[in-house]
Curated annotation (Swiss-Prot):
SUPFAM superfamilies: Glucocorticoid receptor-like (DNA-binding domain). This is Small ribosomal subunit protein uS14. GO terms for cellular component: cytoplasm; small ribosomal subunit. Gene3D superfamilies: 1.10.287.1480. Binds 16S rRNA, required for the assembly of 30S particles and may also be responsible for determining the conformation of the 16S rRNA at the A site. One of its GO terms (molecular function) is rRNA binding.
Length: 101
């Protein structure tokens, strides 16, 4: 089980990234606009750098919704590999069957 503080910290990062998504994307689009002069684009890059670091969506980690484990995460189910195995063995995941040949 992951530490609760790390799970809460990651939730805060996701919330901040969600709140500042539009502003960050607007500044990024202005920075990538080739019609603007290089000097102005450097100033826009400085503006992008002044945004909070945790407002970037790349800084949040995918975590298991049950245990909070950050590694071995399956996006399709939203859980870690360990919980996937447990729930699949119990038959709690629809459409998941144990393979045999």
């Amino acid at each position: 089980m992951a530490k609760k503080a790390l799970v809460v910290k990651d939730e805060r990062k996701r919330a901040l990234a969600c709140r500042s998504r539009e502003k960050r994307s607007a500044v990024r689009n202005m920075r990538n606009d080739k019609t603007i002069s290089l000097k102005e684009r450097v100033a826009i890059q400085a503006k992008l750098n002044s945004l909070p670091r945790n407002s970037s969506p790349a800084r949040s980690k995918n975590r298991c919704s049950i245990t909070g484990r950050p590694r071995g995460y399956y996006r399709k189910f939203g859980i870690s590999r360990i919980q996937l195995r447990v729930l699949a063995n119990w038959g709690k995941l629809p459409g998941v069957v144990k393979s045999s040949w």
